Structures are given as C-alpha cells and as structure tokens.
C-alpha cells in the first residue's frame, strides 16, 4: 500500500512532510528517534525489515500512540521506496529517519516554519548538521563524537515537488534508482545548512549514534555493522568485500572514513533528550 495523495488543498496550504522510518534491530534508540521526528511530520511511516529484537513491538505501540503514524512490516527494504515513490510531483517533503538518528525537535519545528514560508521551494535536498556519536553520557546530557562538517552529512530531506518520478532499482527508500527532475531542478539544487550555521545554532541537527550499540541483541563492534545499502545495494561491492574477507585481506571501514573526520568534540544533548519516551 503506497502513501496516497493529499486531500485537495487551496493555494494557501503548506507542503506536507512525510517521515519515512526504516529499521532493522534498532530497539535502543528507535523510540527516541521516532518521537523526536514525529512533531515535524504530517504523516510518518514506521517500517521494519526483519527485526528480531524489541523493535517491532516498539513501532507498533508508537503507531497506535502517534496519530500521524502507521506501521508496515516489509519483506524486502525496496518496499520502503515503493511506498513513497507515488509522492513524486506532489508538494511533499520526504524525511528519512534511521533508528540511530536522533533529531532536535525544537530545531525541526523552526525548520518547518522556514519550509512553510517557501525558503526551500527551489531546493531539491536539505543537508543538516550531524554529530557522529562515539560516546553518550549515562545521563544522556552530553555526547562526544565527530561533527559534520568536516564529516559527511547523512541527513535525508527531499523535496518531491522537484521531481516527476523516482523509479528504477531502489534498494531502499530514497537510495539508488533513477530520479527524473522537473524543469528547472537538478541534483545540485541543495542547501548545505551544516555549512551555514554552527552546531549550536542549527535548525537541522542530528545525533547519529552509528558508533554505539543500537540493538539489545547486538554484540561486537557497532562500527562494523552493515547498513541496508551494503547488504542489498551495489552487488559488485558486496562481492569484492566478501572476496577480501575470504582471503584475509582488510575491508575498508566506511564508517570510519566518513564519520570520524576532524577532532572529537563533546556537546550538550539536553535538546535531544528533553523528555523521557
């Protein structure tokens, strides 16, 4: 079942924001990730692919508690993109949230005001500030990690009014496939908000807990956990990684290369954990 069109709206209406959560074994942070993102969204899809920890019960409970949420259990991650592909061409922003991405809700609400005011009407994609977390205080009042910039920003907020379609082979939502842009838009139409304001003043900022355990069933080094694109994306890259492992050659840790750039810093996280779930 795909997300349908919005009801008929008048010219004074604002864009819809559709949250797109796709997770697998993320029961440590997923509730906080969803609750922080939900006030920003008009509608939020909670999608699970094969979780064996407590993720599914958490998402089902949130789908009942949050009026804008609905739960989907997927047989393959590609279904997450199929659910939203029909939104192309509509006045909709698609906001992808992973189970290890905790946003500043107050900042998101300020960003929503800017979107409603039309500031980003000619923008295809918005990139925000990120702290790639290597340590989180026990009281969750502070965290240490590496900031974007200089790290790569991994936030995913797309203006579907800029495209006619997003089809082709998309292994998961908002990844891969073939994007067909409307006249006047290109893939380069991006706003790098992480370059426009420091972390403390950013309206679009995220704690990315990629170096922390994200599942109660997780063991070993969280930094080596494969993401969906590694499992289902470029087949040649998967073959090369497997071959290197078989012959005992090292495999590049992409998380370190993307998310451990620059100095390690410590920041306050009170804005991200202002209330208990």
Where are these regions (language model features)?
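N-proximal low-complexity "stem/linker" segments adjacent to membrane-targeting elements
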Residues: 1-35
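Catalytic-site signature of metal-activated, phosphate-bearing donor transferases
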Residues: 2, 82-84, 92, 105-277
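Catalytic phosphate/metal-binding cores of nucleic-acid and nucleotide-processing enzymes, i.e., regions
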Residues: 24-25, 52, 74-78, 101, ...
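Glycine-rich, basic loop-to-helix element that forms the pyrophosphate-binding segment
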Residues: 33, 75-90
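Short beta-strand/loop segment that forms part of the nucleotide-sugar
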Residues: 42-50, 72
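A conserved acidic beta->alpha catalytic loop
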Residues: 48-59, 76
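Conserved donor nucleotide-binding strand/loop of the catalytic core
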Residues: 60-81
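Short beta-strand-to-loop acidic/aromatic patch adjacent to the donor-nucleotide binding site
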Residues: 91-102
